[in-house]
């Protein structure tokens, strides 16, 4: 199964991107997290709208690192990450995918965000109606962000 998800870039990410232009501190999207926090609890067929001020992914049930080849470009300003779940990775309810960034470079060697383990943060959140995944399902969530 494959699903397309358009994720909202969070305010904290926009702040980091603005600071990157000044300081050179950089990050990249390194992994994703899955939760069941993306649907309307009163109507699971409806995705909730992500709040750009959110800073975490809620009740995470699974995380996985991206590997080379997991990102493609729908257009020059629209990267898409393939969030691949193998059979047995997740069972149960899924309605939210979070793209997680890791600080990769700090021009100031005393910056604590670059001390290992490097700082990680939620870059973007994609929500969808509730999906139920069984132990035998192989699922790909194609998560895009737009600039």
Where are these predicted regions, by residue range?
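Small cysteine-rich, disulfide-bonded extracellular modules of the LU/uPAR three-finger superfamily
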Residues: 1-95, 102-147
């Amino acid at each position: 199964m494959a699903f397309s998800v358009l994720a909202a870039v969070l305010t904290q990410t926009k702040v980091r991107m603005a600071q990157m232009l000044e300081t050179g501190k950089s990050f990249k999207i390194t992994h994703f997290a899955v939760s069941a926090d993306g649907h309307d609890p009163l109507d699971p067929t409806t995705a909730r709208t992500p709040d750009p001020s959110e800073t975490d992914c809620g009740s995470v049930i699974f995380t996985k690192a991206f590997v080379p080849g997991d990102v493609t470009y729908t257009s020059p300003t629209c990267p898409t990450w393939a969030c691949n779940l193998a059979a047995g990775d997740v069972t149960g309810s899924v309605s939210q995918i979070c793209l997680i960034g890791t600080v990769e470079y700090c021009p100031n060697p005393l910056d604590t965000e670059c001390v290992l383990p490097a700082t990680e943060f939620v870059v973007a959140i994609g929500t969808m109606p509730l999906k139920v995944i069984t132990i035998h399902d192989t699922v790909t969530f194609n998560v895009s962000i737009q600039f």
